Each structure stands twice: as C-alpha cells, then as structure tokens.
Amino acid sequence: MVENSIHETPDGSHPDKPATAFTPLLTTHDWNEEWKELQKARRAADDASHWDKRAATFGSKDAPNPYVERFLDLAGIRPGESVLDMGCGTGALSVPLGAAGHPVVAADFSQGMLGVLEDELAERGIVSVTPKLMSWEDDWAAHGVLHDSADVAVASRSIATADLKDSLMRLTDAARRRVCITLPTGGSPRTDERVLTALGLQNQLGRDYLYAFAILAEEGLKPEVSYIESARPDTFDTPEEAYETFSRMVDDAVGSLVTTAERDAALARLRPWLADNLVENPRAGLPGRKGEPEKRLALREPRKVSWAFIAWDK
C-alpha cells in the first residue's frame, strides 16, 4: 500500500501549505506619509507675519502657568542643563528656564515674538537665554544648532510643520540626553470638539500625537506619554461675535471634508447651541489669559484643550 505523502494535522489543515498572507499595518505602514496626506485637508499653518502681528498680545507673564509648570515638571530638566527651546514664542518656557540659570537657545521664526521675549529678558535681567531667529525648515547647523548642541530639546505647542518626522528627528539630533514635546490630542487647539459633536460633525483631522508616537517607535526610540489639560476660557461681546468665531472654527476644522449642505445644516444648529450655552461672564472686565479684559459673554463650560506630552531619552 502506498502511503499518502501529504499529512494532515489534527484540525485537518496541511502544515506545508502557506498561511494566508497578512501585512500588519502598525509595523509596516509609513505613518509620516499618511500624516503628510492629512495636512492637505487641514487649515494651512500660520506664517511668521501672522505671529509677528499677534506678538503684541502675547507675553511670558500671561502664559498659562499650570501648563508651564506641568510641562517643566514632566520634562525633568536637571540643574545646569542646557536647553534648545524650538518654537519658543515669547518665552513661556525660556523665561522660567533662564531665571533658573539654564543656558537656553530660544528659537522662533517670528521676529515679533522674539522681540517680546527680548524685552522680557531685559526687564528681568536674565542673561542666559539667547534668542535666535530660526524656523523648523531652516538649516539649523548654519544657525549654530549642531548635533548634540543642547542637553535637552523642547518644543512646546510649536510643531506646525510640513514634515512631522523631519521635525522630530531634528530635535533628536540636537539633544544630547532628552527631547520633550507637546501636541494636541484633538484636531487643533483652536477646535472645540464638543461644539463639532453638537453640530453633528466629526473632525477626522489631527491626532498628531499618535503619528508622532508611531514615528518615534519606528525609529527605535521609546517615547513616554503624559497629558496636560489646559483651559481656554473664550469670551465674546455679543452672541453674533460668538457665532462668527465658531463658524470660522467649523470651516477650519472640517470645511474641506463636508459638503456645502452639511456645513449649512451644522451652522443652523449653532445658534440654538449658543443660546443654550452662552452665559454672562462673571469675570467680564478682568484681565484674561493674555492680559486683555475678558468680554461680556462666555461659554457655560470653558473649552479645554488636552495636550499629549511626549518625551524620549537618547
């Protein structure tokens, strides 16, 4: 009798038969390229001239201190360590770091923001912070930011670039010991996800922190993630101002992803939602986050922005 040369396993399968092909996206997908594709549908990042104009409304004194304190606590910067603060703005991190004696290179692409920072440093007599006009896309080496040029590199709420991986790797290259960044967990710090949900809209853009984590892991790094909650108490003089503000938010968040009919239907729901959620602001006239007087109306529940704090050691 001739024995069958093909043997079956107890479950009836053939051990020498190829398994069904399977490609795990998590470990094979190019997350940076997908992130770039998403950017095509997002609102364009503000340029340097925009931030130059806004600089007058900013100041490190007016920075949200709970956010800054939490960032610095999580960063774990050691006494005397040097810091690269990329996208420093008016110095929300650079000023307290400089006041604590850290040598800081404070880089930003807005001369207006750096001007406010320089005034603050002069007023407080801080000499260990060096402002530097430099963008994410510039040749950092040409600006003196070389490999391992700082003990710690930070980018607080400032990664608004065309290439997420390139920005993350630039920070990694510049740091000797540690890198710390924050990215919004939602679509944008300008977006109130509650409003979008109430209007029947879904923001499919953003979630940059998930892409950053995946990119860093692909590069063999071990990112750690924590979260910082930051309140944004928006105020308005009139219901119409609130309507116009949130209409712009809708267009920025999902304008390229919905039809005109869907947009019009969402905005039709906005006025009733505002009627239910706008209240008299008990802090009207008092200094707000940026030092300007708060306006007459506010949302019943202030908007909250959740930031993902991502750090990795080298």
Go through each PLM region and give its residues:
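Class I SAM-dependent methyltransferase SAM/SAH-binding core
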Residues: 95-139
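Conserved class I S-adenosyl-L-methionine
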Residues: 3-76, 178-204
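Class I SAM-dependent methyltransferase "Motif I" SAM/SAH-binding loop
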Residues: 87-91
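A short, conserved alpha-helix within the catalytic core of class I
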Residues: 160-172
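Conserved Class I S-adenosyl-L-methionine
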Residues: 227-314
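A conserved beta-strand element that flanks and buttresses the S-adenosyl-L-methionine
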Residues: 154
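Short alpha-helix
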Residues: 205-220
